[in-house]
Amino acid sequence: MRTTIRYAAVLSIMILAGFAASGAAQAPAAPATTTPTAPASTVPAVPMQWVAAMYNMQGGGTTWVTLHADGFSSPAQVQALKDLLKDQGQTAVVNQLNGMPQIGWVRFGKQTGYPIPVIRYIPTATGYRIVAVCARPIGFVGAVTQGIIETDYPNGVVTLDVKTKGNSAGQVLPAVKLEFNEDGTFDPKVYGTAPLRLMQVREESAK
């Protein structure tokens, strides 16, 4: 049975990092889910690359994941996508993402990489966060997207929380539906029963 689950943590990530422009006009997130941010700083030079071990919470072993960025999306670019979603719906956003240039990719094991048109770099109090939005679902062996209808859950998301000290981690959300609540709050719905955990996250030399 297919199940749609809402994750509060995912909602916080997407509102704060993926689909909210920095600045005014955004409702403040609840204290329990807000990630403290560091003062604004210059976006680092690209290319950048990270590697992580992906653990399937439902079993299925470990896969090494590589995320590569040749550029980062600006708050204005992300706000434009948010406005498009609110005004014209998910299909319009998907069409826009498919027409945008690729600024990165994510690869699972030795499989062909998934192109990424949107990557956000957000400084935090403990390091920085990366939110990468794919133009299509992430369907790899063992993922929860098997048999999914791409028109309903058309985007995949990869997040990394990279810390200057301590362990860094992240998540893979193989398939996400883009929606707003009645109050205008962005409310993504995740297909499947659980996200896929990323552990042992570290930067590596970009090739």
Each language-model region and where it sits:
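Boundary at the C-terminal end of the N-terminal hydrophobic targeting segment
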Residues: 20-29
